[in-house]
From Swiss-Prot:
Belongs to the EPSP synthase family. MurA subfamily. This is UDP-N-acetylglucosamine 1-carboxyvinyltransferase. Its main location: cytoplasm. It comes from Lawsonia intracellularis (strain PHE/MN1-00). GO terms for cellular component: cytoplasm. Disulfide bonds: none annotated. Phosphoenolpyruvate binds at residues 22-23. The active site is at 115 (proton donor). Pathway: Cell wall biogenesis; peptidoglycan biosynthesis. The gene is murA. It is an enzyme of class 2 (transferase). It catalyses: phosphoenolpyruvate + UDP-N-acetyl-alpha-D-glucosamine = UDP-N-acetyl-3-O-(1-carboxyvinyl)-alpha-D-glucosamine + phosphate. NCBIfam families: murA (TIGR01072), PRK09369.1 (NF006873). InterPro entries: Enolpyruvate_Tfrase_dom, Enolpyruvate_Tfrase_sf, MurA_subfamily, RNA3'P_cycl/enolpyr_Trfase_a/b, UDP_GlcNAc_COvinyl_MurA.
């Protein structure tokens, strides 16, 4: 099993390029099964979750060719079953539920897996698809759905679920009639999915707002499309520059989508400039404490909570983090504490009192973003940090140690 060995204390300096967005690429890949002609996707990151999705789509009947960041998907005879051995490793697999029902009128999908960061229930997906005419049973760990034809309707989501909005957006694009999604998630990745579907011939209005109108069409065509940059990877690199008191130009970085993150970093005393080719982070001497509450977009993203907590751990003063999106998303706290961080938990709130320095230690990643926070802490720590379970990191970061080493980090990957 791979592990990362990080020698901390080196300020980062140089230019790092942001990869394509994992959270946009996954639903777009899955939506491609609705196309009746070849789909070509560019800027697709080379990640473990992408490879899992490709395997799943091949089992469902698609032919896929991949060359680095380009994927060509050719539709075939679509199958309706998503097997446990793939779905159990990646939560986004549940996104095949809506499109399979929309195109085939039936679906058999194993209950999903992925990061262990709380219940993350799929009941909102199921309730909404039932309102569109689907019926579901649960048998032997599989969710089995069937319908004559999904029909457009008015759906109010009790919570602006990202996965639920994506599932319904894809399914409604070839449903019969108009679907209105109210209280829809507004994340940029959903906008990217909508733009892809529109490029394939879907009729969608209001994407990027909390009310989306989808007029179903009989079928979707193929298209050529480029995946948006990964705002969470960009935010992670911003944090890497600040935590090492380094100087980075983050190329291909979406400024508008990062405003909630950038505003918090500026409150911490970090100097950030918008440049034509990306975002510049200047060296800093002292980090200030701040308070963060995770919210759906355009609020501060839960996927950056662990990373900013690593930064807070060496900031002057006491910071707080309120996690409102997922339960059990503080599993990185005890690992940061092993490195000397002073963090106290009170329910869904973490109180972080900054320390003078972190110290290298053996730590273990528990999920994707927790693993990123440990890498960041390791970059800043005095001494050697060893991170086990790097497969979590590989689910969402493309060549992270290579990118960081290229700007001055000292990270070695070993297999034991």
């Amino acid at each position: 099993m791979d592990k990362l060995i990080i020698e901390g204390g080196y300020p980062l300096k140089g230019t790092v390029t942001v990869s394509g967005s994992k959270n946009a690429a996954l639903p777009i890949l899955i939506a491609s099964i609705l196309a009746n002609k070849k789909v070509t996707l560019h800027n697709v990151p080379q990640l473990r979750d992408i490879r899992t999705t490709i395997k799943l789509l091949e089992i469902l009947g698609c032919t896929i060719q991949q060359t680095e960041q380009c994927i060509e998907l050719t539709p075939g005879t679509l199958q309706h079953e998503a097997p446990y051995e793939l779905v159990c490793t990646m939560r986004a697999s549940i996104l095949v539920l809506g499109p399979l029902l929309a195109k085939l009128g039936k679906a058999k999908v194993a209950m999903p897996g992925g990061c262990a960061i709380g219940a993350r229930p799929i009941d909102l997906h199921i309730k909404a698809l039932e309102k569109m005419g689907a019926k579901f049973t649960l048998k032997d760990g599989y969710l089995i759905g069937d319908c004559t034809k999904l029909k457009g309707t008015h759906i109010y989501l009790d919570f602006p679920t990202v996965g639920g909005t994506e599932n319904l957006l894809i399914a409604a694009s070839i449903a019969e009639g108009e679907t209105i999604l109210e209280n829809a998630a507004q994340e940029p990745e959903i906008e990217d999915l909508a733009r892809f579907l529109i490029a394939c011939g879907a009729i969608i209005k209001g994407h990027g707002t909390n009310v989306i109108h989808i007029q179903g069409v009989p079928s979707l065509n193929g298209c050529t499309y480029s995946i948006m940059p990964d705002r969470i990877e960009a935010g992670t690199f911003l944090t890497a520059a600040a935590i090492t008191k380094g100087e980075l130009l983050i190329s291909g970085c979406p400024y508008k989508e990062l405003e909630a993150i950038i505003n918090k970093f500026m409150q911490m005393g970090i100097h950030i400039e918008k440049r034509e080719c990306g975002i510049y982070v200047a060296p800093i001497k002292t980090l200030k404490a701040t308070d963060v509450t995770t919210r759906p977009f355009p609020g501060f993203p839960t996927d950056m909570q662990a990373q900013i907590m690593a930064l807070m751990s060496i900031a002057y003063g006491t910071s707080t983090v309120n996690e409102t999106i997922f339960e059990n998303r503080f599993m990185h706290v005890q690992e940061l504490a092993r490195m000397g961080a002073n963090i106290r938990l009170n329910g869904h709130t973490a109180i972080v009192t900054g320390v003078k320095e972190l110290k290298g230690a053996p730590v273990m990643a528990s999920d994707l973003r927790a693993s990123a926070s440990l890498v960041l802490a390791g970059l800043a720590a005095k001494g050697i940090t060893t991170i086990q379970r790097t497969y979590h990191l590989d689910r969402g970061y493309e060549f992270i140690e290579k990118k960081l080493n290229a700007v001055g980090a000292s990270i070695q990957r070993t297999n034991e």
